Amino acid sequence: MTQQVDRYAVFGNPIGQSKSPFIHTLFARQTSQQLTYSALQPEHGEFITAAKAFFSEGGRGCNVTAPFKEDAYQFANRLTERAELAGAVNTLKKLDDGEIIGDNTDGEGLVQDLLQHQVTLKGARVLLLGAGGAARGVIQPLLDQKPQQLVVANRTSSKAELLAEMFSSHGNIKGIGLSDVNEGFDVIINSTSSGLSGQLPEVSDVIFNSNSTVYDMVYGSGTTVFNQWALDNGVHAAYDGLGMLVGQAAESFMLWRGLRPGTKQILRELRKNLEM
């Protein structure tokens, strides 16, 4: 009798560029887990139908990327606290009782990557650029690290202020407009997607100093536009979001399989793969 192989997947649209199947296949090999992991692309507005079909046909869990994270939030029967706070779900798991739990591992992926790079978050002044879903998903894990202050800056200041209000009981956080940022920070995190179109967020280079560590959530084969700008302004170090991608994947894998895979080797493989 052949052993039943557990099925996992990632949902997104577009999904052709996703590195998740590559990452999870390597995780499975590393931890000797029998599973398959595929990329699925439902039409816009079709996520819930596709997810229902996936789970009813024996799917055990899935990752969810743009534009379906809010849909996944609605789809889950239960939510972890961090998913509830993030208002979005990037990981779904079918429990033994048939219930589907939604989690958000993005913030944990970011924090783990920063800590792996030996970035000090405790007592640091942290600037988070952008106030969209990507920003909201990482605020609570960042505040859990006890920074001196987390400043969320966004083109529309009211969105940043709203996020600050939402998370005010979790730590020292304030929201302002991008044009109001007029001082340097220890850690600067870019959650805006402006770099994907070669643009920079409309913020002054006064944010950078020689002790600043910069983190851009986007990644590519070379240095990101934002990180290049930061390096040109003399920052201490600049990292892209590839480590966050691998970190959030490791956290999802842990939720599904109860095992935490190592990330360093896989990050090296992925980087090599990107640069080919």
UniProtKB/Swiss-Prot annotation:
Pfam family, one: Shikimate_dh_N
GO terms assigned for molecular function: NADP binding; shikimate 3-dehydrogenase (NADP+) activity
Broadest EC class assigned to this enzyme: oxidoreductase
GO cellular component: cytosol
Record field: catalytic activity: shikimate + NADP(+) = 3-dehydroshikimate + NADPH + H(+)
Family (UniProt): Belongs to the shikimate dehydrogenase family.
NCBIfam families given in the database record: aroE, PRK00258.1-2
Name by which UniProt lists this protein: Shikimate dehydrogenase (NADP(+))
Encoding gene per record: aroE
